[in-house]
Amino acid sequence: YDKIETIRKQLLNSAKELIIEDFGAGSRKGLTKKRKVCEIANSSLKPKKFAQLLFRMINYYQPETILELGTSLGVTSAYLASAKPDATLITMEGSASIASIAKNNLNQLNLKNVRVVEGNFDETLSNTLSNIRQIDFAFLDGNHRYQPTIDYFNQVLEKSTENTIIVIDDVHW
């Protein structure tokens, strides 16, 4: 956990500014075009205890294919990927500038089992799923609006088995 938490601390202290495009429900602070990495980290990163719970779930259930909607800065992605290095993690992020930071963080951790897909889930999820035989574990944490979440869940369900685990985060309907 230590290397990932070091990256979390760096992100929480980063004053670097990004131009972002938010396709989801937006942050609690509202949509803005220019945001500091530390602001994104403060509002979007999963708390350590929840990210580590996901790590333990992956470690226990040993899924082969993991799908994450909502890469953000890559901290939770790092926990998912490091829990089972021989699994494939496909993580999706709407904002190219945020995805770029995530890729850098995942590379820093030398996680080779991750593929980052950039773009609006409405435009990228269907094609991404068409290239996956089945999903063993899905973490839906990207767009928090009701209808898109239901739509994404139903698409993921088509690639699920009776043993698939689907975790939906931040549901506030």
Language-model segments: residues:
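A short alpha-helical cap/connector motif
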Residues: 1-137, 143-167, 171-173
